[in-house]
Regions:
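N-terminal glycine-rich phosphate/pyrophosphate-binding loop and immediately adjacent elements
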Residues: 1-114
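Active-site-adjacent bridging/hinge elements
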Residues: 15, 179-184
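Helical element adjacent to the flavin cofactor pocket in flavoenzyme catalytic cores
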Residues: 185-221
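Conserved active-site and cofactor/substrate-binding residues in soluble primary-metabolism enzymes
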Residues: 47-50, 144, 148, 199, ...
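Rossmann-like flavin
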Residues: 79-179
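Beta-strand segments within the central parallel beta-sheet cores of soluble alpha/beta enzyme folds
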Residues: 13-15, 68, 163-169, 210, ...
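Acidic/polar loop patches that form or flank catalytic/metal-binding clefts of enzymes
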Residues: 35, 48, 164, 220-221
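Generic, well-ordered alpha-helical scaffold segments in large soluble proteins
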Residues: 3-6, 152-156, 168, 207, ...
Length: 221
């Protein structure tokens, strides 16, 4: 899309009969399913724009997609022992964690603040592409970004249920917290709200293709 916007002649060859790859939907009976999208991070708010929103705005597609704020991150269900909806809003999320370990209330807040701090450094990597990446500009990434996530979490939290709640969502990354780099863990738990997309992920792909063709690009299926 950037090439097309710069005036280049661009041909996109797609093996499927619709655009999008993992960003597609399909219909079975009365239901429409998303192929891969569970929730979309990085949209943020008007006051605090996320990195994904910034990219969509740069590509002139943000206003062509309708985002719906998501109230729950996920629900944990352990046999018949526990059914726990995990809220997406920061205050409610922290309150849920603290209810299982009141004695670690302050440490839970400190750990979440650390998650958000390293996430902000992660976001700035995009803003400073082409700039100098060093320990002065990105101290947390250099200091603890490559340490195992569980090792960092152990320094703040001891309660196994709180650790479990923090670890469940990381299944989407396919790497357990004991070896997952902390940078990816902290980035995943920067609670700047998640969103669904009206029409599913296909709406994102369709908006990108529409803008691509508007800029002179050609798509062949």
């Amino acid at each position: 899309l950037n090439l097309a916007k710069s005036g280049k002649k661009v041909l996109l060859l797609e093996k499927h009969n619709i655009p999008g790859g993992c960003g597609t939907t399909f219909i079975r009976g009365r239901y429409e399913f998303d192929v891969g999208l569970h929730t979309l991070w990085g949209i943020g708010t008007d006051e605090k724009k996320g990195h994904v929103r910034k990219i969509f705005e740069e590509l002139d597609v943000y206003d062509k997609i309708e985002f719906i704020r998501q109230d729950e991150l996920y629900t944990i269900n352990i046999l018949d022992k526990l059914e726990l909806p995990i809220p997406f809003y920061k205050d409610k999320f922290l309150a849920t964690l603290q209810s299982f370990s009141p004695e670690e209330k302050d440490n839970i807040i400190k750990f979440q603040e650390l998650n958000e701090a390293i996430a902000q450094e992660f976001y700035r990597l995009y803003d400073e592409l082409g700039g100098e990446i060093n320990s002065e500009n990105f101290p947390l990434i250099f200091e603890i970004g490559t340490r195992p996530a569980m090792e960092v979490m152990d320094e703040y939290i001891k309660n196994p249920i709180v650790k479990m709640i923090y670890s469940v969502y990381l299944g989407t990354l396919g790497i357990p917290p004991k070896i997952l780099p902390y940078l990816l863990f902290g980035f995943s738990y920067e609670m700047n709200t998640g969103h669904h997309v009206k029409g599913g992920a296909q709406s994102i792909s369709n908006a990108l293709v529409e803008e691509f063709e508007r800029c002179g690009g050609t798509v062949m299926y």
